[in-house]
């Protein structure tokens, strides 16, 4: 089975985990729907039995309207591509997938850096970045909770 983790923000990333090979492939979130689809296609071609966990996101009242709109558009593009490839998808809140990793810092930059370090410890063979760490950890959360 292939498990895809997606952090749909513009600075997010994609993690593709092959359970049979115990290998993780990471991508920074692509800029175009064509590039997004290419990543999903690669996973689906490798194994028809593919599942996705995507971070369920929403805009905050403090977000600028244009950035909130872009954020929502990116999320919608991912859902559309996953639907077109007929990939079952679970939307998970950040609170849910981060819960087993608590306690985490309240300050966003500190929390992001700690999440990155956790992912590096779990996947030392991969080049984990701030862009890809959340996606990788969502895959771990799914595997541990399926």
Label each PLM-derived region with a short phrase.
Residues 1-146:
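Phosphate- and other anionic-substrate recognition elements at nucleic-acid/protein interfaces
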């Amino acid at each position: 089975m292939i498990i895809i983790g997606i952090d749909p923000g513009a600075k997010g990333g994609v993690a593709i985990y092959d359970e049979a090979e115990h290998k993780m492939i990471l991508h920074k979130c692509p800029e175009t729907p064509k590039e997004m689809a290419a990543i999903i296609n690669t996973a689906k071609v490798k194994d028809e039995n593919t599942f996705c966990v995507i971070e369920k996101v929403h805009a905050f009242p403090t977000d600028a309207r244009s950035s909130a709109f872009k954020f929502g558009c990116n999320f919608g593009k991912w859902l559309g591509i996953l639907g077109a490839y007929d990939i079952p998808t679970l939307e998970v809140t950040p609170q849910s997938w981060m819960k087993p990793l608590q306690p985490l810092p309240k300050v966003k930059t500190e929390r992001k850096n700690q999440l990155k370090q956790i992912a590096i410890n779990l996947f030392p063979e991969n080049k984990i970045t701030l862009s890809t760490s959340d996606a990788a950890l969502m895959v771990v959360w799914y595997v541990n909770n399926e």
